Curated annotation (Swiss-Prot):
The protein's name: Urease accessory protein UreF
Gene3D superfamilies: Urease accessory protein UreF (1.10.4190.10)
Record GO cellular component, one term: cytoplasm
Pfam assignment, any one: UreF
Length: 220
């Protein structure tokens, strides 16, 4: 619960992951189009790449395989196609790593392994924190994906803008699809080799457009 809290001081509230640019371009303009956008990102970006990668990172940390964890951390960083997306995961990963250090999560050796990540990405540090706490993989993965969903909905409420009830309706709809998304992520992570798919050209294009957008509330 702690790791999925919107009060976690890692700056998630300041990012929209391209949603603000989609609003500016008219791709997102009301509750229905917002729901369609977030659902699309959930199944084409999160379920196919970031969530299964989180599983691989979690298993590496739990097995004490620092080399594998560092390798998947670098893979994720390289897969971020725009400067804003790279800066986002770097900043949030760095902030979560600092929190883990200051609160003394896990062992000194594990904290040192996290500190050695160059750069630390959010899924790598989040997966390590869950492994430090000996959380079940399903619980940690669910917390990671749901916190992403909440952040997307919160960004839409501010950016479209939408009302609070619209946000809750969207969360209810999106939450109903989470079991299938998590199952897909686990299956992709368990394949040999892992079936990671980062093909999301529209996501990359709107993120790139956001870098030069005239008026912005969010950092991505």
């Amino acid at each position: 619960m702690h790791l999925s809290s919107p009060a976690l001081p890692i700056g998630g509230f300041s990012y929209s992951q391209g949603l603000e640019a989609a609003i500016e371009l008219g791709l997102v303009h009301d509750e229905a189009s917002t729901l369609a956008w977030i659902e699309s990102q959930l199944v084409t970006v999160m379920a196919r790449a970031e969530a299964p990668l989180w599983c691989l990172l979690f298993e590496a940390w739990r097995a004490g395989d620092d080399a594998a964890a560092h390798g998947w951390n670098q893979w994720f960083h390289a897969s971020r196609e725009t400067r804003e997306l790279r800066q986002e995961t770097e900043q949030m990963g760095r902030s979560l790593a600092r929190l883990a250090q200051e609160l003394g999560w896990g062992t000194a050796a594990t904290r040192a392994a996290v500190a050695a990540l160059r750069p630390a990405t959010l899924p790598a540090v989040h997966a390590c924190a869950c492994a430090m706490w000996a959380l079940p993989r399903e619980a940690g993965l669910g917390a990671y994906v749901f916190s992403w969903l909440e952040n997307q909905v919160a960004a839409a409420i501010k950016g479209v803008p939408l009302g609070q009830m619209a946000g809750q309706r969207m969360l209810e709809r999106l939450r109903a699809g989470l079991p299938a998304v998590l199952a897909d992520a686990r299956a992709r992570a368990g394949a040999t080799p892992p079936r990671l798919d980062t093909f999301a050209p529209q996501y990359a294009l709107v993120s790139a457009r956001h870098e030069t957008q005239f008026s912005r509330l969010f950092r991505s």
